[in-house]
């Protein structure tokens, strides 16, 4: 518009000289609309919210205006008081000569942001923002994960499902006058922001609470360095609880140590000790190296093999294979695995999933250690079968035992039940997936019977028993490896099993790192297994198995 024409139009419309200046400075601007991240829900009937976005405000400053109006110190003092910040921190954000933009503080709640607005400070404004919020703080922290400062998932489901959870920002392209007032009738583009998809987990908040409470009791009672538990549906691979200690507050993840951030259920590798015997003996039975009633000489507690002495915790003479499982004889198991041979032992452990990631839909899973047979020493076959010289994660060990419960079929564990878009479309649905067969259904049936004897009188896992239900499982007490040998004071205690033994529904593993002073799996981990199993069976209303005449099986207590 020419200068003369513009002045004539201004006079005709009655526009003042100041307003004429604002009109003259009309310009086009773009503004991003912040997207909302999807929510995370548990898998219970109540669909409890585990993570969501809250609407908050960021405090934005134009330092040049504050300096020009000599209000820098006043703004610093008032904002620091309202926001509960150190004055030096606020001053550091505001005292920037020549700058037109500075973010003073983030994530202001309604009351605080209104108080900032009421200050009426020139050069201070509020900008809409969102904050990721976790209603239950540390509860289920290792599974949920957190959103880092860049707005990207930093661990757990937040990281693994980030592509689904994150939304898409919108865009408003419009025109503003010299006072930065938008001329709405001149809007060029208006693309709304798209909310991210919601994630529904297989985890049940109620069972998770049972697991976490049991872990806290274990940590306190045994002064452990760490403890973790997983509960899995044996037929499907659904994870209904996964907890790890120590834990951290998701709303204050920056204060957490690396030890607290670690999800030990999938990210901590340890030598399993005697829980591995369930797999190696299953392999021997499947290859018909022996039968359940085959008798082996357990050498009264000391066996010289390949120049090395292998000992039992208690000395035994002649034991059947069934009693080798029940008594957890190192020597009896080692004799079976030596007869089986290194190649076959390695093949079966691989079939069970040892040495490979399970493929669970969570980041941070370790694959454990199962060396190729060519790297085995002359005693490896006798030691790996009893859980030495091989390392696993708790999820690997549990998933392998669940295969025995599931007629020999290995399932892929999963934790995401469903992904639903903001407009209600199901984008992904978790489903049971068979990985392969580890042993025959006949061998699996025999192993279930043998493992159920572990919790009967005279077995190593009597403290894992559950009233009115049969329990199958295996204890583990493993010395921690140090400097090419094994510690005489640091142990990993565990119990892994499934219930009911007669008609398996749930697999559970409890692992405790460096309990003191007692350190055996049967004393430290088995009671926690019993507590979780008892409460979970009741919660899921899993019926007490009945024998053929219709009567209930008698209590194991």
Where are these regions (language model features)?
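Short extracytoplasmic
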Residues: 26-54
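Short, basic/aromatic recognition patches
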Residues: 18-33, 207-222, 267
């Amino acid at each position: 518009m020419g200068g003369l024409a513009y002045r004539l139009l201004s006079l005709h419309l009655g526009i003042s000289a100041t307003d004429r200046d604002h009109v003259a400075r009309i310009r086009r601007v773009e503004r991003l609309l912040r997207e909302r991240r999807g929510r995370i829900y548990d898998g219970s009937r109540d669909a409890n919210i585990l993570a969501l976005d809250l609407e908050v405000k960021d405090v934005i400053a134009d330092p040049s205006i504050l300096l020009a109006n000599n209000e820098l110190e006043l703004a610093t003092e008032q904002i620091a008081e309202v926001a509960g910040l150190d004055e030096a921190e606020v001053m550091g954000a505001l005292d920037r000569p020549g700058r037109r933009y500075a973010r003073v503080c983030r994530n202001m709640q309604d009351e605080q942001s209104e108080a900032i607005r009421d200050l009426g400070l020139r050069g201070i404004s509020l900008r809409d923002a969102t904050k990721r919020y976790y209603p239950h703080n540390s509860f289920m922290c290792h599974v949920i994960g957190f959103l880092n400062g860049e707005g990207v998932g930093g661990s757990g489901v937040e990281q693994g499902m980030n592509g689904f959870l994150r939304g898409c920002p919108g865009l408003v392209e419009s025109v503003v006058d010299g006072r930065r007032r938008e001329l709405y009738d001149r809007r060029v583009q208006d693309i709304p922001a798209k909310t991210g998809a919601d994630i529904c987990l297989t985890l049940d908040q109620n069972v998770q609470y049972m697991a976490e409470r049991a872990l806290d009791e274990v940590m306190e009672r045994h002064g452990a360095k760490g403890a973790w538990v997983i509960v899995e549906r044996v037929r499907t691979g659904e994870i209904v609880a996964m907890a790890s200690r120590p834990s951290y507050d998701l709303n204050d993840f920056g204060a957490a140590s690396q030890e607290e951030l670690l999800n030990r259920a999938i990210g901590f590798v340890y030598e399993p000790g005697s829980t591995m015997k369930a797999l190696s003996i299953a392999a021997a039975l499947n290859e018909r190296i022996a039968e359940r009633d085959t008798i082996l000489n357990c050498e009264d507690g000391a066996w010289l093999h390949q120049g090395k002495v292998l000992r039992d915790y208690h000395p035994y003479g002649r034991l059947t294979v069934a009693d080798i499982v029940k008594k957890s004889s190192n020597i009896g198991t080692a004799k079976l695995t030596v007869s089986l041979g290194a190649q076959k032992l390695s093949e079966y452990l691989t079939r069970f999933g040892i040495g490979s990631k399970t493929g669970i839909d969570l980041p941070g899973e370790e694959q454990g250690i199962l060396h190729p047979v060519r790297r085995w020493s002359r005693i490896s076959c006798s030691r790996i079968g009893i859980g030495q010289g091989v390392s696993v994660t708790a999820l690997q060990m549990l998933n392998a035992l669940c295969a025995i419960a599931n007629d020999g079929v290995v399932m892929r564990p999963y934790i995401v039940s469903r992904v639903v878009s903001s407009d209600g479309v199901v984008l992904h649905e978790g489903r049971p997936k068979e990985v392969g067969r580890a042993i025959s259904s006949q061998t699996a049936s025999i192993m279930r019977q043998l493992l159920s004897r572990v919790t009967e009188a005279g077995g190593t896992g009597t403290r894992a028993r559950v009233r009115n239900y049969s329990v199958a499982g295996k204890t583990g007490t493993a010395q921690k490896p140090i400097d090419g040998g094994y510690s005489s004071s640091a142990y990993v205690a565990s119990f892994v099993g499934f219930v009911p033994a007669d008609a398996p529904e749930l697999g559970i593993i409890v692992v405790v790192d460096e309990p003191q002073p007692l350190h055996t799996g049967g004393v430290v981990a088995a009671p926690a297994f019993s507590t979780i199993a008892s409460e979970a069976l009741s919660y899921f209303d899993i019926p007490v198995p009945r024998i053929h005449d219709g009567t209930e099986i008698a209590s194991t207590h």
